[in-house]
Amino acid sequence: MLFELSIGAIIGFLTLYLLKRFNESKNFITPDNLKKIPIVEGAVPVLGHGPAFSKDIMQFMKNCYKKYGSVFQLKIFRTNMVVLCDRKLSEEFFKSRENDMSLYDVLNRLFFGLAFSDKPDSLEFIIKMVKKTITIRYDDFAPKIMDEAQRLTKIMRESHSGKKLDMIPEIIKFVSRTSARCFIAMDIDDEFYDALNKFTNLLNKIVVLTYFVPHWLLNATLNRFMLRKYRMRMTKLLENEIEKYRTDLNKSDSLLFRKCVDHIDPETGATLTNQDIGDIVVCLLYVSSENTSLLATNCLIDLTLNPKYWDLIKSECSAMIALGDYKNLFKAPLLNSIVMESARLNSHVFALARKPKTVNRIGDYFVADNVDTISLCEPALMKFEIASDVYANPNSYDPVRFMAPRNEPKDSGHVMNWGKGVHECPGKQFAIYEVKAAIAYIVTNFERFEFNHNDLKINYFSPSAMCEKNISVEFIPSQQNIHNIVYKDRTYIVEHIKCNETSAWLIYNALDRQQQREYYQYTYEISTDSQEHKLIEKAGPHKPFPIAYDKLVYTGQSNCMTPTKWYDFASDIWELLTENYAELGFPIYDDKIRNFVPNSFYGQLYSVESIMPTHRDQHVDYGLSISIGSNCEFVIEDKTILLPSGSVLIGDFSKISHSVSKIFHEKPDHLSDFEFFNRVRFSAQIRSIDPDVQPLMTTQEFLDMISEY
């Protein structure tokens, strides 16, 4: 009721105030050496370009760029805004100092100063204190992030399984709890989170209202009677924890609390009150939870709309999740790329803005005194056609653009959501860790979401740095088919992949790094004198090419010494599977399984251009496929999986349609000093063949056959 009354009062004062502002006008003389910024036509009284802007924000911005160029001025209700769609000017924008173009003035204009403190001029101090205390203690924070992501998964399984819901609130809770555990060393309870959630939702509404409602009115209504009360409730709940740091001067579980309690104003000698410290915490939790949760949600929606990448991320992360291996998870190349791609494609239309103070120019353009903000149109520089100077097909979802050999830029000056320069977000890397953990746990524990794309609602004018995508999704737990198998004092991560006629088994960590080095070097040495080591130099890079083979299935020929080391390895893998057949669903009663004796070996090298078309093996059935080197995008029937270096795929390949659709460029560092003949991935197939079977073709016929791939 109070909110409705407040809105009524706001509307009552709105017309008089905005009419007054509309009637105020000035003439500004442009200096001879500067260009005049073109003003977008079509502004209407009081509302400015608001109506046209709100119909289709992105198309409106594209139309403005097409008509007026890379710099133009528009009016959104009571805000005069200069918009930059120019990469060179974005560099100047990021280099500007606070006293020239102010971020804090913009934030105060959006009501953040009044939102976070009873002292409106304290926002700059609050943000500086947050920056000073955001130190990422990786080994301390990473396990907490993983623990909270696991908790999120458990809640979704136990409380929301089979229900349709908006995922944003659950992700916000995950981020809030994670940030609280890491930065203030506290588990926030439901009472605190309820206040934070109400504070966040109301502040988001107020931020939007600031574009057409004066601050004094918002402060006298929504802030005084509602927003401030939520903030005070949160700071009250923090008092007991703050007092622990006042009592114990050596307590340092939270760097933020420690720094705040120890802070002494250099001019007045005053210390911070509990309320001051609480305000800093509220600011931190609001900023971190809002932006990070939207990015995580956008990533999951983008993965849903691009199912191949959902499957690939699941494949890349499954073993790391099973082992609790956060170090490799946070470094996983494809996971990192999908986070940056969703950030690039899902920015707020004007996430970065500054208030001109001591400057009256940007580049060669004159900035008039009536300009309230200078804003970067981030989508223009990241995903509009304008961005094709940096990004290939910029409006398309293509995470591998950031990976070698393309290496399209993902630094702060290009993927701009966290800002750059003096005002770059200090918690950027921490936020990315949170997003990666949430994505990895959700993708590996739930089926890919299903929804009608037409039901997706997108707000590019949200109160956050990211656009807000809203859709209700159903969390359906996926079948847990990944197993931790202990064999010979070592834990192996094995995934049971069910196919149409049979199954396959993927052992993610069959070979550790040292073994990968040993086995590849062994393969190279036993075939050193073969003609294939010379022929591969002339072979086309788009074709996989053999370097070592023994008792080749097709010809019965060998070009190397008997690879005993490989056959012993295959026997161990077979024993691992048969000893754990019940858990893994391995068909030990199949005669082909019981009689499997590894005696045929085929090792080939792939370049980044190599592919293997979809096929079923015609002359062999069960076997092992070992991967060493760059990751491989492997299609197995209707599933796309990632074969990492050191993995082994086992199955009856005569009953499984399979192909190699992509080779990633990044060969692991631990293999960088080995001879790969300018290729990046080694694949070995080990089979069991009948020694009495006659050869199917000559060696030359075999070489002619593989040249057709």
From Swiss-Prot:
Q: Does the keyword Methyltransferase apply?
A: yes
Q: Which residues form a coiled coil?
A: none
Q: Which GO terms of the cellular component aspect does the record hold? A: membrane
State the Gene Ontology BP annotations.
methylation; sterol biosynthetic process
- Family the entry assigns: Belongs to the cytochrome P450 family.
Q: What does this protein do?
A: Catalyzes the 14-alpha demethylation of obtusifoliol to 4 alpha-methyl-5 alpha-ergosta-8,14,24(28)-trien-3 beta-ol.
User: Recorded GO terms, molecular function?
Assistant: heme binding; iron ion binding; methyltransferase activity; sterol 14-demethylase activity
Per its UniProt record, the required cofactor names are: heme
Instruction: Please name the pathway.
Output: Steroid biosynthesis; zymosterol biosynthesis; zymosterol from lanosterol: step 1/6
Q: What is this protein called?
A: Probable lanosterol 14-alpha demethylase
Q: What is its EC number?
A: 1.14.14.154
Query: What PANTHER family does the entry give?
Result: 24-HYDROXYCHOLESTEROL 7-ALPHA-HYDROXYLASE, CYTOCHROME P450 FAMILY 7
Keyword field: Heme, Iron, Lipid biosynthesis, Lipid metabolism, Membrane, Metal-binding, Methyltransferase, Monooxygenase, Oxidoreductase, Steroid biosynthesis, Steroid metabolism, Sterol biosynthesis, Sterol metabolism, Transferase
**Where is it predominantly found?**
membrane
Q: Can you name the source organism?
A: Acanthamoeba polyphaga mimivirus
Q: Write down the InterPro entries for this protein, in alphabetical order.
A: AlkB-like_sf, CYP450_sterol_14alpha_dmase, Cyt_P450, Cyt_P450_CS, Cyt_P450_E_grp-IV, Cyt_P450_sf
Which annotated residues bind heme?
C425
Q: Which PROSITE patterns match?
A: CYTOCHROME_P450
The entry's localization annotation reads: Membrane
Which reactions does this protein catalyse?
a 14alpha-methyl steroid + 3 reduced [NADPH--hemoprotein reductase] + 3 O2 = a Delta(14) steroid + formate + 3 oxidized [NADPH--hemoprotein reductase] + 4 H2O + 4 H(+)
